[in-house]
Amino acid sequence: MSVTFAQGFSAAGVAAGISSVEGKKDLALVVNNGPLDAAAGVFTSNRFCAAPVQWSRKVVADGHVKAVILNSGGANACTGEAGYAQSVATAETVAGLIGAEPNDVAVCSTGLIGELLPLDNVLAGAKSAHEALAATAEAGTDASHAIMTTDTKPKTVELTGSNGWKIGGMVKGSGMIAPQLATMLCVITTDAVVSAGQMQAALAVAAEHSFNRIAVDGCMSTNDTVLLLASGASGIEPDKDEFNKLVREACASLSRQIIGDGEGASHDIRITVTGATSEDAALACGRAVAASNLLKCAISGNDPNWGRIVSSLGTVPPEVAPYDSNKVTVDVNGVRICENGGAGRDRSEVDMTPREVHIDIDLNTGSDAEATVWTDDLTHEYVHINADYES
């Protein structure tokens, strides 16, 4: 059901002729029918942020969003004033259809960078999507399909609070995934009665511990957007801690689904760093290992090459992550193949057949801070997908 799982939301996904793939659903519309229209958002940190990101940041700033229109088939990034005007025109069209103001409508785009969208198709698609709006499971599924690019499957989540309020969500993302968000569009909905301020606080923490801790290829997108919308339709004001927990669980589920659908990936790699002096230190170490293309290629070949793990770990400056390299241990899928900075058990003992590969690094500093990041291996198929990618 995706974004329609929570009460008070309707959605649609239609083929608007934006994508180069004929007949593909490429435009989604999500409408918050209230009674509340509270909203929160986090966006890309890329300095070349796309026109729809620039627009949607302004929309979300006042904590109110009545609708989100999303398209695949074109990023509308690096398109200057003309691209921004397209985002405004799109918001104006949707606002007119639902009886709202343009600054109540967030706009999201994903696809090829550097080209304007076929605006006539976008606006006509918005009207078609409005006509198709429904609060059904099928409508939510259609919306989740419409935002896909190189994704091989839709990614959705549905969670229910202890007293019946709900969270639903959808995300797209498969490649161009790096820390500080990624090439992903995500809409999460809830029918809980919550304020925009509470939502923003919950989403910021949830994103930091989920979307900001995955990396498929280390490439940061211009278009990342994560929106959290509340309709209040359940009439239930949730416990604050439970609300924060479920938002975090929703983001964790969606981010893991991105890793599970990484472009061409044959292994999902979980990297956990423990025994660090701080969480930031552990995170820096985990990200350094996750960024190693040499390691990712080795994992693709079912080789738990611990030398590539520690060589990447060693690139983290000591002022960022102090540790003694002679005390570091590395386990892969439960086998300690690096002991005290040197060889441990033979790496042939590691079972590399599971889809998930767990790399556990203990810095043994005497402190107990830790962090986990996720990445994928690097395969021939990843190169093939991105060599041929157009939109």
What are these regions (language model features)?
Residues A91:
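Generic structural marker for isolated residues within well-ordered, non-membrane alpha-helices
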